[in-house]
């Protein structure tokens, strides 16, 4: 298995995985240009796990500055592994790459948002050393 940064030609396969991950309606507006913008942004990072020319998982995160911290923070935006590759270390390897890159960027902390019912994910993140920190609130605009 290879972990690498995503490239523009990964768009079609990545969007198929996104649709499996969250459903088509949520990301139907994410087009090739938007994907390109994310890949070209200095504050966004997309890693893919590839096995025999097939993308089997991905992790995306962003880096930003906030007033309360001297150094930037990183936030995991998405982590997804296709079902047949789960429990094989793919997610852990993707997260190790995210953490390595965040450290290279001198990030102070990595934040992860997770749905409160996603107990399998919570156990996964806790096994990687993350702690439940609080609540996230959202409002669609």
Residue ranges of predicted features:
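Conserved beta-strand in the GNAT
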Residues: 48, 54-63, 80
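Conserved acetyl-CoA-binding loop-helix of GNAT-fold acetyltransferases
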Residues: 87-100, 127
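Active-site rim helix/loop that mediates acceptor-substrate recognition in acyltransferases
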Residues: 27-46
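Conserved active-site alpha-helix within GNAT-family acetyltransferase domains
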Residues: 92, 116-134
């Amino acid at each position: 298995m290879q972990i690498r940064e995503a490239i523009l030609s990964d768009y079609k396969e990545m969007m198929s995985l996104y649709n499996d991950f969250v459903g088509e309606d949520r990301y139907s507006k994410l087009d090739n240009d938007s994907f390109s913008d994310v890949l070209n942004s200095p504050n966004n990072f997309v890693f893919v796990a590839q096995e025999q020319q097939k993308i089997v998982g991905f992790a995306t995160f962003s880096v930003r500055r906030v007033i309360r911290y001297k150094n930037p923070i990183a936030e995991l935006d998405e982590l997804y592994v296709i079902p047949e590759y789960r429990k094989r270390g793919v997610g852990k390897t993707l997260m190790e790459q995210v953490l390595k890159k965040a450290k290279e960027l001198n990030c102070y902390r990595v934040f992860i948002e997770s749905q409160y019912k996603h107990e399998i994910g919570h156990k996964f993140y806790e096994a990687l050393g993350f702690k439940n920190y609080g609540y996230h609130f959202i409002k669609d605009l």
